[in-house]
Amino acid sequence: MRLITQEAPMGCAIACTASLANLSYKQMRTYFDNGIIKEQTHGFYNRDIINALSNIKISAKAYGMKKWGNKNIELGTIVFIERSIKYTAGHFLLKTKNGWMNPWINYPHINPAKAGFQKTLPGKARWVIEIA
């Protein structure tokens, strides 16, 4: 899994799935319904990610943290962190062997946005999307 920078304010879901699928951001965006609109407006939900991955034959399932419990988060898992002062809309990150792939590690700077790896999640996990 390689670094993929999100190319729009709400494009973290696209960047994480692109990295997981070894596709470019633009290639992956085509697998999201209304991706070019949602990346600029309200972003994506778990079902959008699951459907996009399904479109490229990757099976996934979403869990809330209450249901997930203390289970270990495996490589290739996408996590949504809850809204916070820093991430006012929440944020998706991808678990990799290099740590958490953050598609906008230099938030809030958008010009240019940069992706990077970090050792810990920058917030509290709210949702987990696991590859089946």
Spans of model-derived segments:
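Conserved active-site-adjacent core of cysteine acyl-enzyme catalytic domains
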Residues: 32-124, 130-131
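Active-site-adjacent structural segments surrounding the nucleophilic cysteine of cysteine proteases
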Residues: 1-38
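Short intrinsically disordered terminal tails
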Residues: 1, 131-132
